[in-house]
UniProtKB/Swiss-Prot annotation:
Gene3D superfamilies: Fe(II) trafficking protein YggX. InterPro entries: Fe_traffick_prot_YggX, Fe_traffick_prot_YggX_sf. This is Probable Fe(2+)-trafficking protein. It comes from Cupriavidus metallidurans (strain ATCC 43123 / DSM 2839 / NBRC 102507 / CH34) (Ralstonia metallidurans). It comes from the Bacteria.
Length: 91
């Protein structure tokens, strides 16, 4: 049976992650409070931030930026939006 959590991002009961997605306290907090659906949304947003801001993931500053954005996305006032990003038109 799937583990259920009250997702802090979607504000509903949903299937939880199978394991903490990050090491440390932030990973544990995400595992306890974030659903698979919300995590998938973050992965798409994270990819957009990496691509639009041309982040080099070998750079420790870029990784630290993404960790801060992860925390803001789920537990703060929302993550940054990529400058100049225009979402595709709805079909």
């Amino acid at each position: 049976m799937a583990r259920m959590v009250h997702c802090i991002k979607l504000n509903k009961e949903a299937e939880g992650l199978d394991f903490p997605p990050l090491p440390g306290d932030l990973g544990k907090k995400i595992w306890q409070n974030v659903s698979k659906e919300a995590w998938a949304g973050w992965l798409k947003h994270q990819t957009m931030l990496i691509n639009e801001n041309r982040l080099n993931m070998a750079d420790p500053r870029a990784r630290q930026y993404l960790i801060k954005q992860t925390e803001k996305y789920f537990f703060g006032d929302g993550a940054d939006q990529a400058a100049g990003y225009v979402p595709p038109p709805a079909a």
